Amino acid sequence: FFYTSRRASAVIIGFLSGNCTIYKLFGLCMVLVLVSLLWLQLSCSGDMSLPADRHPAGQQPPCTADCQVSAADDASWGPHKLALVVPFRERFEELLVFVPFMHTFLRKKKIRHKILIVNQVDHYRFNRASLINVGCLESGNDTDYLAMHDVDLLPLNDALDYGFPADGPFHVASPELHPLYHYKTYVGGILLLTKKHYYMCNGMSNRFWGWGREDDEFYRRLRKAGLQLFRPSGITTGYKTFHHIHDAAWRKRDQKRVASQKQEQFKVDPEGGLTNLHYQVESRQELTISGAPCTVINTKLECDQNQTPWCVLT
């Protein structure tokens, strides 16, 4: 194609070297149109990709959309299906890494799944717990358990269990394995639990605007609901079990504590959760990132500033 373009350029230069007439200009326009159409045809059609039998050794041709969907939800993998809920706002670089990585990881383990990116699009401070509540309510009847999963934490050990946690909540990113947080009551990062158990806790508190502390409150909810917490065993990779891709220098977390939030952060919210969650789904978008399907749920949270004035920074 590039050789053809050079020939066309030489023809055009020679063509213009003589006397310029309206017919020559018309002919030149036609040549340019034909060259443009040829370029468009080659760049937009599948002709520029390798045939199926000419892909490099070990590399399969791209999967079709139907293939991608079936690869995420193969009924032969078992009766349970995971809703991987990712609370999200503006971390697009991390998302581009996370979705293909997790889709491949779960496929390898034959975990039926769908990835839900709950994207906060309102003007309030980030509320991770409320977004996870939204993810639970919007996950559909085809899923029966949840993964509360941070977008910046990637599992590196194939022995980590993402299966159905029938006996109780399963903390994948346990304090013995998480690269940053090592206190005993930590339940953040990646936590699996059945929807039944999540409803028993009334979800997570909606009072935690800004970064942090919602996991500690949820730990107390698990205890109150009488649920036993399980963690991985036999994992020998220690703090190298996960790859933490958050760049603190580039994306600073909102850790400000304002008004009475400093006192509220250590209290248990006895009534809040799924039952008093207020939100609007602005739109749902089915996306494919490097061959991995996911659903983006653009969500506007609502805040009663009389109850939690710290949902905004003044």
Predicted regions and their residues:
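A conserved hydrophobic helix/loop-capping motif in glycosyltransferases and polysaccharide synthases
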Residues: A83-R91
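Eukaryotic beta-rich interaction modules
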Residues: V33-L37, T64-V69, V97-P100
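Active-site-proximal specificity loops/subdomain of glycosyltransferases
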Residues: F92, L96-P100, R107-T143, P175-P179
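Short acidic, S/G/P-rich loop/turn micro-motifs used as interaction or catalytic elements
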Residues: E90-E93, L153-P155
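Conserved catalytic core of nucleotide-sugar-dependent glycosyltransferases
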Residues: G18, H123, A129, C136, ...
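Short boundary motifs at domain starts and secondary-structure transition points
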Residues: S70-G78
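C-terminal catalytic/acceptor-binding lobe
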Residues: F2-G46, L50-G58, R207-G210, D216-T314
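Cell-envelope/extracellular polymer assembly enzymes that use nucleotide-activated donors
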Residues: H80-A83, K114, E217
